[in-house]
């Protein structure tokens, strides 16, 4: 097993004394150096000792939740239950990720609530990731370029995967599309060997010429 990247200190959480701060034992990433304090965990089962994943600020990962890969938590974010956070995921603000939610790619910030069997993931075509912010709630599955804002809700059982580079904005009362590239009139290329038909103009005879 690789050398441990963090240890659990004796610094207890002010409200949940069974949670303790972590401390980096080596440089983890550019903004996390050896000796830096991080957020709170319940045990080493909450944060992988491998990769560049990290819990910063006053963020909490507890119960059976697990953070791994390159995921980053900060501010007062809370991950609990059996939730799993990985990949290029960024979780901040007062976000709560719980139950069996899985985030493999996404940016979450604000008073967001992600629970149930929710999933956030990157689209396999564009690599785009969803953004969930402000007071949005997600119970369903989102992939690709989305921005879910304000008090919008993605209901359970809903799966939306955006395979385009356009950003789909979902608010509580509206859906809007932000086009990444200017739309131009399409230019069509003729198939190989195509020859346009020659049109023959027939002169209409005057009635006097028919006599």
Located regions from the model:
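Feature marks extracellular polysaccharide-active and adherence modules
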Residues: 56, 62, 68, 74, ...
